[in-house]
């Protein structure tokens, strides 16, 4: 068994060599970016999985042999720098018509759902580069996305005919978790790459069988800029803990929030009846229950990740597309995505599962639409449904949208939760209309 494991850990000749060609500065530089197709290829190479579904069981059995190579403590692992995990990836939409067809919409815009898939794959590869052992090929770690903390759109001018570039690196490290900062740029007519979005993902390392936690290499900042990034990672962790502690699933709304719900309730009472039971909808308003859209997908092997679970990027794409359709149907015009935040991957989705998505508008303000998507799965053999994800998307419409009114206490909690996510959004941006981002 051990000999077989050593055979699997042969010297690596084909993997990325991180740290080479980087120069310290406000942004790291590399000699040659990866093509977007190489990202998944590198992940398969690092994990050592088969590209053929029928061989997946054998490939996973081989990974069991790597369990003995996991470190017993983080102290035995060499510290890494942010430059060690830095990667640039090119999405050549301008020069590859076949690839462009995968990303273009009927309105000649870019499918943001595809961008979410690319960000998820890039985040995992960045973490493998942080933990890469130069003398080995296959990694004993199983690195998975646990949280999409925030994706902020800083420019909404994505053209399907101009190249896109992604960059990413590890910005904070705990014992078994890592925060990844990623940016996206697009080439413009001035031959310069302009920023499009900033993304923060949280990844966790697990053992070779993806059954328990595993230690990751510590991170050492090299300068003040990196120290600030690392401190921000600590603050993000504290913020997430505080947000979870104050969840409406755990504690009652604040007094201010209770007043908001009561005012909404009073606004919907019929003045003719003077009764708590008679409800009417105010002008230019919509009941929350009337904004729902649902979808069902069968999770085929084609959508699996390198660990033979359903690819997290696929789940995000399907959720986003349903959310966009919900916002479009509600607002009456094509919406623009502004922010994606707080996507927690609570449970893995197995191949063969039935994926149920339910989307609804839960909060609106002026031109903004806050959409929540609930994801749950069931197996073909069981009727039991389990929640896997809750997605939060903030959209902006070209025109002012109707107000949302809840009817029940449960819907009132969804309203307050949506309001909280909306308020956590960065400063509202002015959206450009030349190439809006669509699914």
From Swiss-Prot:
InterPro entries membership: HOTDOG_ACOT, HotDog_dom_sf
Disulphide bridges: none
Subcellular location as annotated: Mitochondrion; Mitochondrion matrix; Mitochondrion inner membrane
Documented EC number(s): 3.1.2.-, 3.1.2.2
Pathway membership, UniProt: Lipid metabolism; fatty acid metabolism
A single GO molecular function term of this UniProt record: acetyl-CoA hydrolase activity
Regulation: Strongly inhibited by NADH and CoA.
PANTHER family xrefs: ACYL-COA THIOESTERASE, ACYL-COENZYME A THIOESTERASE 9, MITOCHONDRIAL
Subunit description: Interacts with NYAP1, NYAP2 and MYO16.
Function in brief: Mitochondrial acyl-CoA thioesterase. Catalyzes the hydrolysis of acyl-CoAs into free fatty acids and coenzyme A (CoA), regulating their respective intracellular levels. Shows a clear preference for hydrophobic short-, medium-, and long-chain saturated acyl-CoAs with some activity also with short-chain dicarboxylic CoA esters. Regulates both mitochondrial lipid and amino acid metabolism.
Family: Belongs to the acyl coenzyme A hydrolase family.
Protein name in the entry: Acyl-coenzyme A thioesterase 9, mitochondrial
Gene name of the record: Acot9
